[in-house]
């Protein structure tokens, strides 16, 4: 976990969506001067980041992420940290029993991520990014959101229909994430993009394996790896044996 004290200020802030309850903004952190923005002639991706906080709290500019933003920009990446609506704000403890509430919160965040993505795609020249070179990343609730977003795209759901036809992200980075499925398991109709997962095996907030009630399941990194292996998908998984949810802040 990088030092939170490493101060870094955004190079730009844009409003990317207006909702009934709030306006949504994104902070853009450009690659540091003199940093390497390409590898062997290939441009490094733009990285969208979604903060954590259990869909109850959290902000795009929480100083605990400053160290990671600085490290990424010093390594030649453009980072875009986005707002999303907190669908569980004001809720009491939400577990699998209140799954409809959780489902709504996750998809609200996914909807906001897709709006941010469309804003970047519509202004690709300004962001100096190719449409096929955007990576999504997140911590905790943000990690759930990015994993769920790719699940929606790979399965061609109505949620993903707001994106340009044929669009997909270049990759997903999940710090203690999971996927919510009503199908009893996680299947992909189309091949998902390359996925990096980090998860503590003793995580009690976002399950490392799964929580399942009938066909409804919340599938963490440990369980998802089994599916990724089975289908020969492109993934990298870092298991942190004995660690809990602190891995959500390990970037």
Named regions from a protein language model:
Residues 6-42:
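N-terminal cap/lid segment of alpha/beta-hydrolase-fold proteins
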Residues 41-54:
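Short beta-strand element of the alpha/beta-hydrolase
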Residues 54-57, 79, 119:
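Serine-hydrolase catalytic-loop signature spanning alpha/beta hydrolases and amidase-signature enzymes
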Residues 60-82, 89:
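Short amphipathic alpha-helix adjacent to the substrate-entry channel of hydrolases
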Residues 100-126:
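Alpha/beta-hydrolase active-site loop
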Residues 118-191:
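Primarily recognizes the serine-hydrolase "nucleophile elbow" in alpha/beta-hydrolase
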Residues 160-231:
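The feature captures the conserved acid-bearing segment of alpha/beta-hydrolase catalytic domains
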Residues 229-251:
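C-terminal catalytic histidine-bearing segment of alpha/beta-hydrolase fold enzymes
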């Amino acid at each position: 976990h990088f030092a939170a004290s490493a101060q870094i200020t955004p190079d730009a802030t844009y409003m990317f969506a207006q909702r009934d309850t709030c306006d949504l903004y994104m902070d853009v952190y450009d690659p540091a001067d003199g940093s390497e923005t390409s590898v062997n002639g290939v441009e490094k991706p733009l990285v969208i980041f979604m903060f954590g906080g259990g869909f109850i709290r959290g902000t795009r500019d929480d100083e605990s992420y400053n160290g990671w933003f600085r490290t990424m920009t010093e390594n030649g990446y453009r980072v875009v940290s986005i707002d999303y609506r907190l669908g569980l704000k004001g809720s009491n403890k939400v577990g699998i029993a209140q799954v409809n509430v959780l489902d709504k919160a996750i998809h609200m965040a996914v909807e906001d991520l897709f709006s941010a993505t469309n804003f970047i795609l519509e202004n690709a020249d300004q962001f100096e990014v190719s449409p096929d070179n955007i990576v999504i990343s997140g911590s905790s609730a943000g990690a759930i959101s990015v994993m769920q977003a790719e699940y929606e795209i790979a399965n061609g759901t109505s949620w993903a229909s707001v994106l340009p036809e044929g669009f997909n992200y270049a990759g997903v980075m999940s710090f203690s994430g999971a996927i919510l499925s009503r199908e009893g398991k996680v299947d992909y109709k189309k091949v998902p993009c390359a996925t990096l997962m980090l998860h503590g095996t003793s995580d009690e907030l976002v399950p490392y394996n799964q929580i399942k009630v009938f066909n409804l399941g919340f599938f963490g990194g440990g369980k998802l790896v089994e599916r990724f292996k089975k289908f020969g998908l492109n993934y990298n998984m870092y298991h942190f044996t004995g660690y809990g949810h602190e891995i959500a802040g390990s970037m």
